[in-house]
Amino acid sequence: MTEISMLKDVQKIIVLDYGSQYNQLIARRIREFGVFSELKSHKITAQEIREINPIGIVLSGGPNSVYADNAFGIDPEIFELGIPILGICYGMQLITDQLGGKVVPAGQAGNREYGQSTLNIRTASKLFADTPDEQLVLMSHGDAVTEIPDGFHLVGDSNDCPYAAIENSEKHIYGIQFHPEVRHSVYGNDILRNFAIFICGARGDWSMDNFIDMQIEKIRETVGDKKVLLGLSGGVDSSVVGVLLQKAIGDQLTCIFVDHGLLRKDEGDQVMGMLGGKFGLNIIRVDAKDRFLELLAGVDDPEKKRKIIGNEFVYVFDDEASKLKGVDFLAQGTLYTDIIESGTETAQTIKSHHNVGGLPEDMQFQLIEPLNTLFKDEVRELGIALGMPENIVWRQPFPGPGLAIRVMGAITEEKLETVRESDAILREEIAKAGLDRDVWQYFTVNTGVRSVGVMGDGRTYDYTIAIRAITSIDGMTADFAQLPWDVLKKISTRIVNEVDHVNRIVYDITSKPPATVEWE
């Protein structure tokens, strides 16, 4: 099976993973410049990099100290490949340590820096072309470079960091102590663009049309004349996968829509009408509501919920596949963010993802995950490129476990109904207010908390519903949406008046991080 990163005619910049939970944002930013980019293990060898043939290499940040016994290293031959290298934070310290410089705890060189700092450019550099000599950057480091290797020179510093940017112009090796991939580094995108376009010589011609052509070729090569099953949830990811697979293999694709009793209001009928009718996908609808809810009865641990749903979902596929002939592959709408949030060898698992960590070991299918190198906004872009209508492409994201992870604690029919009805009201009012494109994701959660209220002349003791609405670009970081008060008031009033067993509404004003988008 041909991986995109191995295709010789595709320019790519690889990012070596040293453990920062958000280092995949580096790859995302580089893709914005029309250059394919993805993470690779820091254990990659120089020979493996030669085979990939990238035009640039980025060494990411990470939590380790380069002088520690268990520090993540690098194949020293990588520095002799003649490929431009950019080290970010830990990556800069690793370059320094490996090439003969010195790295010490920051207290010995200045001070630790966490947050925005002013970077002062002291020497002209291609990396900082067309950016100001003083600029705000995000620092997050407990170690500092005190001596730079031979052949390197100082490019920039800050009040507490004597070497905030260094370079070896002859070998095209650059190091920066700050994080250009986050928005708090005001000119971070310009710096990464300078590296990709002007230093690495990228053409900037990577597009979704390229992705479609390559994925179709890859799918056909992998599948051959065999059959594929796809689980449809009605969400953006599985819908885009369905259209892409149909384009690649036509009637070799059978879609299974598992109605597990955890869907949004009227979602089952909408899925069948939208994808089965308009796009002509071959869809088998399975009513598995009782099967799922019986297994979930009394389960309040979110990880157990995810595992149960992931396992049972595949077992339902097994049951349906046994009725078909020659089915060898299971397709999923796994995204790049799903894989990262489920943990890599260098990063801690935040939560097992329904498309990654919930699969049983005895699964009978081989997996196909056509979107697993894409971020959410890229999936929407892909949908448009495939000719899908905007109302489908911009459909609200919905997790594989469905409402199970939007009901805190044990699941009951009563709790599910409160979320279904309140979520429908929220989506309706957001659309009426013309905010459905401005707010990246929005949904309601049954918090499992009951509180005292008064309705009419009587005392109530009913559920508290939380509204979660966020703004984001790629789903890796997010801010809570500052919805107009009149819109929030209308939503709240409608929910408590129209939804049974609810008497209180709260608004979640937590960003990501520290919170995740979903509550469970």
Curated annotation (Swiss-Prot):
GO MF terms held by the record: ATP binding; GMP synthase activity
Domain GMPS ATP-PPase residues, every copy: 206-395
Catalytic activity: XMP + L-glutamine + ATP + H2O = GMP + L-glutamate + AMP + diphosphate + 2 H(+)
Name of the molecule in the record: GMP synthase [glutamine-hydrolyzing]
Keyword terms: ATP-binding, Glutamine amidotransferase, GMP biosynthesis, Ligase, Nucleotide-binding, Purine biosynthesis
Residues annotated for ATP binding in this entry: S233, G234, G235, V236, D237, S238, S239
Pfam families from the UniProt entry: GATase (PF00117), GMP_synt_C (PF00958), NAD_synthase (PF02540)
Keyword Cytoplasm in annotation: no
Active site per UniProt: C89, H179, E181
CDD domains reported for this sequence: GATase1_GMP_Synthase, GMP_synthase_C
Gene3D superfamilies according to UniProt: 3.30.300.10, 3.40.50.880, HUPs
Subunit details: Homodimer.
EC top class, as a word: ligase
Coiled-coil region list: none
